[in-house]
Regions:
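Residues immediately within or flanking Cys/His clusters that coordinate Zn2+
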Residues: 4, 44-46
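Short cysteine-rich clusters marking metal-coordination/redox-active sites
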Residues: 7-10, 49-52
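Cys/His-rich microdomains that often coordinate metals
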Residues: 14, 55-56
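C-terminal recognition-helix end and immediately following basic linker
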Residues: 15-44, 61-81
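Glycine-rich P-loop/Walker A and Walker A-like loops and their local beta1-loop-alpha1 context
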Residues: 79-139
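Phosphate-binding/switch loop-helix module in NTP-utilizing enzymes
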Residues: 155-156, 163-226
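Substrate-engagement module of ASCE P-loop NTPases
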Residues: 211, 215, 222-247
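Phosphate-binding/switch region of NTP-binding enzymes
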Residues: 240-274
Length: 274
């Protein structure tokens, strides 16, 4: 189950698979909006709730602030929606940048949300076994078709106990010498081979940082521009994972025009600001 909370005062939205984590995150956000309601009166600190008649006065400022935060947590919890998905924010198509490390629990949680409704899932990754294990362990069944594309040599060699013999899964080992243009063409060919207009397509992409760090900015821009256009034609959901770091900042500024939604992560909660 995925839960969602929207702020009534600004464009902040948050999602989590934990109702409690989301409630605390939303309550902290409300406290930022209403911290002025915490004021000093005589020798004590008082707060008045902006949503109801509740209030409290205490000598200890920290205790008063915590009581106010706890109360706002309660209000936030009353407006949490259930059975929500990040993909709803872009109506299951478009380009989503998730600002977290590709190999992280937060990324896995996002992957599950973006892949859950897909008929065809394409995954471009350096960690093929981990991506397949996630889908195998967390879904009741595979998407109609899953294609994993990776530069990892012998991608399923070693400890891997999942039987894929009857699974609708294809693993494509890419030549490490491929440039962004050739990679984009390969993805396009996979779409041509497996996608039909009535299917929902999700493309997971773990290697943006590798492209940015290996090629110049113009090459990166051209790759993202062309692949974005190709995926838009297929009405695809492109979910991209990149941990914020200085080496990426310039590239992300240039690529911003192709990103429909940027998602941040905060202790198990996905956050969108505007």
């Amino acid at each position: 189950m995925v839960y969602r909370w929207d702020c009534r005062h600004c464009a902040f939205s948050a999602w989590s698979n934990s109702d409690e984590r989301l409630r605390k995150n939303a309550g902290a956000h409300l406290f930022d909006h209403h911290s002025s309601k915490l004021s000093k009166a005589d020798f004590r600190v008082a707060w008045d709730c902006p949503y109801c008649d509740a209030g409290e006065t205490a000598h200890d400022k920290g205790a008063a602030a915590q009581a106010f935060k706890d109360h706002l947590d309660w209000h936030a919890g009353n407006s949490i929606e259930s059975n929500a998905h990040l993909a709803d924010e872009v109506e299951n198509s478009g380009n989503v940048l998730v600002q977290t490390a590709a190999d992280s629990a937060a990324a896995d949680s996002a992957r599950l949300q973006f892949t859950a409704r897909s008929d065809l899932s394409i995954i471009v990754t350096k960690s093929p076994k981990e991506r397949l294990r996630l889908l195998h362990d967390r879904f009741n069944g595979w998407p109609d078709r899953t294609v994993v594309m990776t530069t990892k040599r012998r991608p399923l060699a070693g400890a891997f106990d999942i039987d894929l013999s009857d699974a609708p899964v294809e693993v494509v080992e890419l030549d490490r010498r491929l440039g962004p243009s050739q990679l984009g063409e390969t993805i396009s060919r996979v779409i041509d081979a497996h996608h039909t207009p009535d299917q929902r397509l999700a493309v997971g992409f773990d290697i943006l940082y590798d492209i940015v760090s290996s090629f110049d900015l113009q090459t990166t821009h051209d790759f993202v521009s062309m692949l974005s256009s190709r995926l838009s034609e297929a009405d695809a959901l492109w979910h991209i994972y990149a941990e914020p770091r200085p080496q990426l900042s310039t590239a992300l500024n240039v690529l911003e025009e192709y990103i429909d939604l940027t998602v941040e992560t905060e202790s198990g909660v996905f956050v969108v600001n505007g």
